[in-house]
Structure formats: structure tokens, C-alpha cells
């Protein structure tokens, strides 16, 4: 259970500063998740992770680290790490030794660049603790990636592909040193209690997905069943989440990669059709709050789509890009681009369709292929896609927030020892006049973020 207290002025100021002075929400002692107001007389639950920072007073609290040792810990084989990854481990050990002396919670956010190898690094940490561990991921698509990494430790593990009910039945007769689960498992109270009693290490993968100032499964778990040792893994941390994990290790990876950003500029005559006109009519309505109709109209821009397809084919045929990822926002746009590419490049083109069960096996196959084009959606491939050798990224959609942009760029920024060149292709123009300005603004915003991440911009006329 978290620390329960009335929040005085000093604590209130500290918590508000931590969340960037945005509204502060916590559970009160009645179990209600409410906004914390200054001088409130309610008692609130302060998450354990808040006390992980040495600048925070402990109010006489001490934290223990559990005794749930792996029964097969003598079998552990730690994975090989790159020098930069070993530096992260050394920094964590140094920080945790200080926390142990002060009896603080062993919590930290690992802010590591996309392509750093967070999964391998976290697996190494699990192995060094030698205590039972649970890894939580936001969706099933990432489970296989974790299984590949965890299995190398050579201790017992279970990856829960079939839901929490099946897992609880399995755990009645068997125990495992490591569980890898989807976050929805934590909606089950019995599972939360089991984890709290039997597992000491908790890994929250893709922590940026969760806004812990909102009431959610993860907010409840971290507050009412606080892990003894906890890692948040992310390339793009949320400031609001610092209340739950108030310690961070920030490593920027220096690499020899040559990063090039191509902004393709082609002028088009205006184009429309009945479907586009229907989408355009929704642009100024609340239905377009998340630019859904902007993307629907853009997906039907036949002139822009032709430019994209032609550039992909040219890049692939001239060996400027050998392992290409093509990203769309909408599924129908993905299929349009895929079909057009297949007409020319046939079996070199693959479809990353989240609706097909065979996609997971296909992704695994692509890790062993030297020349391919994968067409997928931002939802499927933007976070957690495990194909380390990608070298080129084509962005077909236009509207992304900064977190999504950085995540998708990370798909091609892994230093795998192959070709040192990494390329991004943006398409800044459209033939649909009603969205032309917006497409330009969002594309330029993406380009600005790419340059901050080390990409050198080159303008090209198609």
C-alpha cells in the first residue's frame, strides 16, 4: 500500500512541480481518484515511487526489497551487452546502492533512445536481481519480442498469450521465475495480489503510453500493489508519471549512423472526387478532432500516392534502401500502397496487418531477410516493432504527435553493424487543396523533430 497522508503546502508544491504544474490526481483514502486541491483536508495515497528520489523526505518511511528469490537462479546466463548498455547497468547499480543505504524504493525510469536495446538491457537487470519478475507490455504484439530476450536467461518463464484466467489456472500448479503479461491482466484483483505476494521486480514496458494522472488499471496497480523494485522503460517519458517513478536515468546514445531526411516536394494539380469531398465536409466538425477525416482524404490522393510508390520503388531498385518500412495512419491507405507496390515488386513487399494472425510469424521471418519492403500502420509498427535491421522509413500519413514521431523514427535507428545509413522520406505536398496547408505544417513539424534526433535534411523534387 502507498503512504497515506494529508498533503500539506510543501508536499503539494513538490508534487505539482513534478507534474509540470498540470492538474494533480491521486487516490484518496476512500478509494476515489480525484484532483488534489491545495489545503485539502482529505488524506491521499502517495505512490511508493515518489520516494525514490533522494531529494524527497522519507517522513520516517523505510522500504524493503522482497525475498522472492528465483528458485532456479543458479541457472541464469546474462546476455551480452554493448559498452553503452553496460554503462547504463553501472549507473543503475550506483543509484540503487545509494537508495538501499537510505532505504528508498528501488524505482527508476530508463529513458533510453529508440534503438538502444531496452529489452535486452532490462532482461540483464532481471538476471542481476535474481528475484521473481513480472514484465508488463501494452499489447500482445510485443510479447514475442520479450520472450526471445527472456528465454536467453535460461530460467523458468511464462508468456501469457491467452489472458489472465488461463494464467491463473496455470499458476495454481506451477511457478515461474518470470512472467510476461499484457497490462490488462492487472484488472484482475486476484492476479494483482499474486504478483504483490510472489514477485519483487516489475518492468513497465513502453511506459509513455500510460498517463498516470488518469485513473486506469496501471494507476491502481502501482498505488495499491506497489512493486518493491520497479523499472519504467521508455524513449519518450511523460512528466506526469514522475509521481509514480521519481528517479530517471537518461542516456543519449552516440552512434556512427549517417541519418538523412529526404523531404520530397512535388507540385500537383488540384484533385478531388466524391469520397474526398465527403471527407473534406467533415474537416471543421468535432468528428475530425484527431484529424481522422484529414487522413481519410489524404489516403485517397492518387497523385501523392503515386509519388510515394514511385519513390519507394526507385529507392529499393537502386539499393539506396534494402529493408524499408512504410507507415500509414489508416488500414485502407496501407492496403492501397501495398497493392500498388506488389504490382511492380511482387514478393518483395510484405503487409504488416494487425488483423492477421500470421503477421507475427511474418515479422519474425523478416529479421532474416536482407531485402524487403514492409507496409504497415502507425498503430502496429510505430511502437515495439522488433526488426532490428531496418534502414529506411517512408511516412505516408501526416498527423502525429511528438511521442509517436520519435517512436516511429526509432524503428530505423538501431546500430546493428550493417549499413551505417538511415533514411527517412517525407512527402510535404498534396493535391487536395483543403488540407494542403495542414499537411505542410505537420510534415515540417516532423522534419524539425527528426533534425533534433540527428537527421540531416535534404530537399528533393520528385
Curated annotation (Swiss-Prot):
DNA helicase which seems to act as a postreplicative transcription termination factor. Involved in ATP-dependent release of nascent RNA. Forms a stable complex with single-stranded DNA, and to a lesser extent RNA. The keyword Cell wall biogenesis/degradation does not apply. It is an enzyme of class 3 (hydrolase). Residues 99-255 form the Helicase ATP-binding domain. It comes from Fowlpox virus (strain NVSL). ATP binds at residues 112-119. SMART domains: DEXDc. This is Transcript termination protein A18. GO terms for cellular component: virion component.
Amino acid at each position: 500500500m502507498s503512504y497515506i497522508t494529508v498533503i500539506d503546502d510543501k508536499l503539494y508544491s513538490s508534487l505539482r512541480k513534478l507534474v509540470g504544474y498540470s492538474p494533480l490526481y491521486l487516490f484518496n483514502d476512500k478509494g476515489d481518484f480525484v484532483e488534489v486541491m491545495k489545503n485539502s483536508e482529505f488524506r491521499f495515497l502517495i505512490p511508493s515511487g515518489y520516494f525514490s528520489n533522494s531529494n524527497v523526505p522519507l517522513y520516517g518511511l523505510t522500504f524493503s526489497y522482497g525475498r522472492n528469490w528465483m528458485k532456479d537462479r543458479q541457472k541464469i546466463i546474462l546476455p551480452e551487452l554493448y559498452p553503452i548498455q553496460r554503462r547504463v547497468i553501472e549507473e543503475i547499480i550506483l543509484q540503487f546502492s545509494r537508495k538501499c543505504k537510505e532505504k528508498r524504493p528501488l524505482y527508476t525510469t530508463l529513458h533510453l533512445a529508440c534503438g538502444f536495446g531496452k529489452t535486452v538491457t532490462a532482461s540483464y537487470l532481471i538476471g542481476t536481481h535474481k528475484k521473481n519478475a513480472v514484465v508488463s507490455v501494452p499489447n500482445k504484439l510485443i510479447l514475442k519480442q520479450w520472450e526471445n530476450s527472456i528465454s536467453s536467461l535460461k530460467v523458468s518463464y511464462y508468456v501469457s498469450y491467452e489472458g489472465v484466467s488461463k494464467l491463473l489456472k496455470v499458476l495454481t500448479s506451477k511457478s515461474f521465475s518470470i512472467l510476461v503479461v499484457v497490462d490488462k491482466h492487472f484488472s484482475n484483483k486476484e492476479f494483482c495480489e499474486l504478483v504483490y505476494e510472489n514477485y519483487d521486480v516489475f518492468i513497465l514496458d513502453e511506459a509513455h503510453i500510460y498517463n498516470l494522472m488518469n485513473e486506469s488499471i496501471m494507476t491502481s496497480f502501482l498505488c495499491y500493489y506497489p512493486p518493491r523494485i520497479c523499472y519504467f522503460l521508455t524513449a519518450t517519458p511523460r512528466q506526469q508519471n514522475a509521481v509514480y517513478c521519481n528517479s530517471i536515468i537518461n542516456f543519449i546514445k552516440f552512434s556512427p549512423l549517417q541519418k538523412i531526411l529526404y523531404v520530397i516536394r512535388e507540385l500537383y494539380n488540384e484533385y478531388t472526387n466524391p469520397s474526398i469531398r465527403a471527407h473534406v465536409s467533415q474537416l471543421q466538425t468535432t468528428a475530425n478532432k484527431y484529424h481522422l477525416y484529414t487522413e481519410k482524404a489524404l489516403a485517397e490522393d492518387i497523385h501523392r500516392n503515386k509519388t510515394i510508390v514511385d519513390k519507394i520503388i526507385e529507392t529499393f531498385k537502386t539499393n539506396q534502401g534494402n529493408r524499408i518500412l512504410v507507415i500509414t495512419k489508416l488500414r485502407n491507405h496501407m492496403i492501397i500502397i501495398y497493392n500498388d507496390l506488389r504490382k511492380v515488386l511482387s514478393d518483395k513487399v510484405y503487409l504488416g496487418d494487425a488483423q492477421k494472425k500470421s503477421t507475427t510469424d511474418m515479422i519474425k521471418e523478416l529479421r532474416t531477410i536482407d531485402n524487403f519492403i514492409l507496409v504497415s500502420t502507425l498503430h502496429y509498427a510505430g511502437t515495439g516493432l522488433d526488426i532490428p535491421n531496418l534502414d529506411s522509413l517512408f511516412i505516408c500519413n501526416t498527423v502525429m504527435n511528438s511521442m509517436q514521431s520519435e517512436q516511429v523514427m526509432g524503428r530505423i535507428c538501431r546500430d546493428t553493424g550493417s549499413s551505417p545509413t538511415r533514411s527517412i522520406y517525407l512527402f510535404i505536398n498534396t493535391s487536395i487543396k483543403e488540407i494542403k496547408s495542414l499537411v505542410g505544417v505537420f510534415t515540417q513539424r516532423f522534419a524539425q523533430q527528426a533534425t533534433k534526433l540527428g537527421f540531416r535534411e535534404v530537399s528533393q523534387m520528385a
